[in-house]
From Swiss-Prot:
Domain of life: Bacteria
Membrane-spanning parts: none
Family: Belongs to the ATPase epsilon chain family.
Subcellular location: Cell inner membrane
GO terms of molecular function: ATP binding; proton-transporting ATP synthase activity, rotational mechanism
Subunit record text: F-type ATPases have 2 components, CF(1) - the catalytic core - and CF(0) - the membrane proton channel. CF(1) has five subunits: alpha(3), beta(3), gamma(1), delta(1), epsilon(1). CF(0) has three main subunits: a, b and c.
Organism phylogeny: Bacteria, Pseudomonadati, Pseudomonadota, Gammaproteobacteria, Enterobacterales
Organism: Citrobacter koseri (strain ATCC BAA-895 / CDC 4225-83 / SGSC4696)
Record's protein name: ATP synthase epsilon chain
Pfam families, per the entry: ATP-synt_DE (PF00401), ATP-synt_DE_N (PF02823)
Length: 139
């Protein structure tokens, strides 16, 4: 049996996941993180994107995170997300529309603030579409 640890993924609205996992992948403030059993203690900000959860026995789940905090302790990991949405609950049409609007805003931006905000919106829309795609593949 593979080594595991306990993972909790919670948002302000609800608990999204609680259980034993073999590993997770998430984008931290310094880049991609792979958290395996026995990982050193860590506290870091999470960038908007997805968390890939590899559950016990290799089953995968994908959740979109709008940002938050990741805490790694011996034997347990906690993700405190600003917003968390399961892949199957994301609306592909809305994500595609958000991507299109963000791309238009980037083209018509008139300053650094407009461009930065539109780029952040584009990154979020692309991350949602990626979560949708991976969720469909895993089903």
């Amino acid at each position: 049996m593979a080594m595991t640890y306990h993972l909790d993924v919670v948002s302000a609205e609800q608990q999204m996941f609680s259980g034993l996992v073999e590993k997770i992948q998430v984008t931290g403030s310094e880049g991609e993180l792979g958290i395996y059993p026995g990982h050193a203690p860590l506290l870091t900000a999470i960038k908007p994107g997805m968390i890939r959860i590899v559950k016990q026995f290799g089953h995968e789940e994908f959740i979109y995170l709008s940002g938050g905090i990741l805490e790694v302790q011996p034997g347990s990991v906690t993700v405190l997300a600003d917003t968390a949405i399961r892949g199957q609950d994301l609306d592909e049409a809305r994500a595609l529309e958000a991507k299109r609007k963000a791309e238009e805003r980037i083209k018509s931006s008139h300053g650094d603030v407009d461009y930065a905000q539109a780029s952040a919106e584009l990154a979020k829309a692309i991350a949602k579409l990626r979560v949708i795609e991976l969720t469909k593949k895993a089903m």
